[in-house]
């Protein structure tokens, strides 16, 4: 079943949307590839930045917030991720109505302003407002339109284009942790934040200039049906639910691989190196599988990658105790989890009308936001109830991946039937 037929087949649930002539999709060209480059840079400074904020946990506990528990401090970093994803439906609706320039420009100001204010913050509420709320919402206004815009320029190459776009977040997840680790002891917290903010500002100038959309955007009056309409589409709801469980599973290793490694005897310095290893490997996970997906079918490759993620968690991370096993898991899980993040937007495009693409991407990310916010506390509570062991926390992650895989498999059957060799 082709992408074109799928797109046409999903116009039914959104009949209330304004009728716009379908744009010509060039599948290449200077403007299209500049959009991919700008979008990758935008994800570098938004999603890539959020990948490294856990490094501030020890800084806050030692200095600015030394009177607070580690659990209290962790809300600052987890809430930034939550705000980035949960406000994505609003970012997506702005994209659908005005194109990428308006939301990305507003987001650029908020993201940089939030980080600058965080550099001056000394109290809990100040850091929560500046880093979690203002910077988080700004990241959402950058992240969602940037991830969506390149998809309007391509049809046959959507997989690899989606992978190249989100690969920027992988590079950010490597560069920013290394920057922060080296800058904190040399220039202190304030100037570390300012240097990162100035770097982000410069890169966002490039993103604002280069990102464009191939779709005609028209402002729409507020209508409840525009917001609830996609949720009447069974295929879309299945993808939302599957995404929730996949993100429920993904963020357990992201959040606990370091503390679990230290718990089982790895040195602190080596344990922290697992973060750039995982993020570095995810670069390949967000590009190579996406290229294969354009040839073999995007749903097919996604289901394989979610299954492999479950196997890695349950068969490798769960019994792992030595340094070699944990490093191997970090690298391999970086590849499979990177593919899940990279292919996610491409699947949304495949079952959605272009006129609602931004909002639908944002809605799926909002479901994912609930997973990212709740899975770390649940995983921590499971470990605490098990005497500090992470055995059942790993099981929770692996089972979440399996449930997400079943949801994707059910959606694939609805779209193309039971044929295992069907490209879908």
Curated annotation (Swiss-Prot):
Annotated source species: Penicillium oxalicum (strain 114-2 / CGMCC 5302)
CC per GO annotation: membrane
Gene3D superfamilies named among the record's database cross-references: MFS general substrate transporter like domains (1.20.1250.20)
Family named by the database record: Belongs to the major facilitator superfamily. Monocarboxylate porter (TC 2.A.1.13) family.
Keyword Nucleus: no
Pfam family, one: MFS_1
Residue stretches spanning the membrane: 36-56, 102-122, 127-147, 160-180, 187-207, 239-259, 265-285, 299-319, 329-349, 364-384, 391-411
Keywords: Glycoprotein, Membrane, Transmembrane, Transmembrane helix, Transport
Protein's name in the database: MFS-type transporter opdF
PROSITE patterns recorded: MFS
Single GO MF descriptor: transmembrane transporter activity
